[in-house]
Curated annotation (Swiss-Prot):
A Pfam match: UPF0154
Protein name: UPF0154 protein MMOB4450
InterPro entries: UPF0154 (IPR005359)
Protein family (similarity comment): Belongs to the UPF0154 family.
Disulfide linkage: none
Membrane-topology annotation of the record: Single-pass membrane protein
Species assigned in the record: Mycoplasma mobile (strain ATCC 43663 / 163K / NCTC 11711)
Keyword entries, A-Z: Cell membrane, Membrane, Transmembrane, Transmembrane helix
UniProt subcellular location: Cell membrane
Length: 75
C-alpha cells in the first residue's frame, strides 16, 4: 500500500507542477509580449506620413505604400 501511495503522490504532484508551470509560463510570456509591443509599436501608414512631414517632404500615397511594402519584405 505504501508503494502505491508513493507512486500516486509522485504522479499527482508532477501533473500539478506541470499545470502550474504552464499557467505561470503563459502569464510571464503574455507580460513580456505586451511590454515589447509598448516599447516597439508596429509602424503604420500614419507614422510614415508623420516621418515624411518631419523630413519636410510631402508624402504621396505611392511613397507611403512603397515604404510599407519594403517594411513587410524586410521582415
Amino acid at each position: 500500500m505504501e508503494i502505491g501511495l508513493a507512486i500516486g503522490l509522485i504522479v499527482g504532484l508532477s501533473i500539478l507542477f506541470t499545470i502550474v508551470g504552464l499557467v505561470v509560463g503563459f502569464f510571464l510570456t503574455k507580460r513580456y509580449f505586451e511590454k515589447q509591443l509598448r516599447e516597439n509599436p508596429p509602424i503604420n501608414e500614419k507614422m510614415i506620413r508623420a516621418m515624411f512631414l518631419q523630413m519636410g517632404r510631402k508624402p504621396s500615397e505611392s511613397h507611403i505604400k512603397s515604404v510599407m511594402r519594403s517594411m513587410k519584405n524586410a521582415k
